[in-house]
Amino acid sequence: MEVSPEEYYRHLYPYDQLVRLLTQNGDELPNIEFAIEGLSPAGDKFYRRYLSVKTAKELKAEVSNFPHVKTFHFGAVYTGKPSGNVRVSAPVRRVLSFDIDLTDKEWIPLKEGGDISLPLCDRAWPVCAASVDLLRRVLELAFGYTQLLVVYSGRRGAHVHVFDEGAMSLSSEGRAAIIGYVNGATGTDKLRSTSGVHLVMKMHNLRKHVRRLFKTLFVVRMGILDTRQARLDFLARLDLEKYASLSDMTDMLIPEVVDKETGKDAWKCIVQHLEGVKQTSPWVLDRLDCAVLAYVWPMLDTNVTRDIAHLTKVPFACHAKTGRVACAVAADELMAFEPGQEAPSLVSWNQDTMDDALLLFDGRKEAMAEAMAEAGISEAERRGEANWELGEQQEQQEDPEDPEDPEDPEVAVLSDSIMAELERKAEAELSEPDMEDLVGPAPRSAVPTNRAPRQALPRKMTFKRKLSPLVPEE
């Protein structure tokens, strides 16, 4: 059965769950901005911004009665009723959001006949899952953020929302500093990652994890080194030919890698050759890291995170092009998640699929997991999928190809100086004239508030505190 967007938002959208999500930290619902997006008969988008509601029922009425509604968004928490006039009401808080879009990875084939292909996007989901996994690790290890909600976008990406109190209270400058830190103050070089990203990886001892993600997901599962051209492209990212001291090694490396039977063998060959020259040229392993990071590390939209007044599409919105619902994804199901099967779709509506997707929102998922455990049924058995969870013993195993970085106290002390520099750059950038529509927060002492004491985010919406590997070690 096909469902129209109007029917979905009138009868099927979970407004009560959304309101509970956005007010769980004690924020007043009337002070949260909502914006509704419609589509005219001519195909032009139009919006209603600064919408304020008192209840979930009122929000449902506003969205349902909006002409030709396509989706709706939530924005910042204001000092009073949301307004475009900062003298009336100014934005002071917002969920810290990150946007991961597969189109930012130039090596992923997403188009077919000139248009974005949904099956190709589905096939590339592991890339998105790896980006989410690394992002949440950095957010916890660097900033202590653990109250995260991951939402599948409906086509080619994911949104990560942080509900920690400290994250929600950040100014636009603070948000810019965080996105700059995660991005490593990235440049425009798409062939390899910047030294900033490499430093972030080393500071948090993520090299082994990054290598494991690349080998298991990208090389073995996705086959990114299966073809001759793909291997030559990867070697080009290393750019080793211009170093005369490595000429003997590169002369052997290229033909050997090209002739390997599988992508996994090609990857092993590359690692072995570079390990062989690390005594005389230790920097080559850093260059390999940067090439790998270009595939694995998340590439994030700065504007989505930086602007405290930015609008964010609500969880469980329907995607205008695919008809899929932007459903939440549990941290321990990132790799097992299959968008084509598990995301509810307006094109062929199945209420059971929607009910399953809502389990993460309304608290039934945890109860069901406990009941299954008592019955001796594993989640992998229920889903009929591979279980990617690891036990404590597996996590302690060493991968001989990817030795873990030792703790480096000299690297760790660089964190404060990097953050200070990123904040300085962010403040300079935000003072530019073309950012005049970016509204900073009012001083906290001048902001009247009746917010209730902070409530902890329900466990069902958060990542597990323990950061377990996303893929198994071999």
What are these regions (language model features)?
Residues 119-145, 291:
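Long, well-ordered alpha-helical scaffolding segments within enzyme catalytic domains
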Residues 405-474:
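Long, low-complexity intrinsically disordered regions
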Residues 182-291:
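Long, charge-rich alpha-helical interaction segments
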Residues 2-117, 302-304, 320, 324, ...:
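SsDNA-processing nucleotidyl-transfer enzymes
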Residues 87-120, 185, 190, 194-200, ...:
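Residues forming anionic-ligand binding surfaces in small-molecule and nucleic-acid pockets
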Residues 394-410:
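Intrinsically disordered, low-complexity segments used as extracellular stalks/linkers
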Residues 95-98, 140, 147-173, 313-314:
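Histidine-centered divalent-metal-coordination microenvironment in nucleic-acid enzymes
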Residues 82-88, 136-140, 144-152:
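Catalytic micro-motifs at enzyme active sites that drive phosphoryl/nucleotidyl and oxygen chemistry
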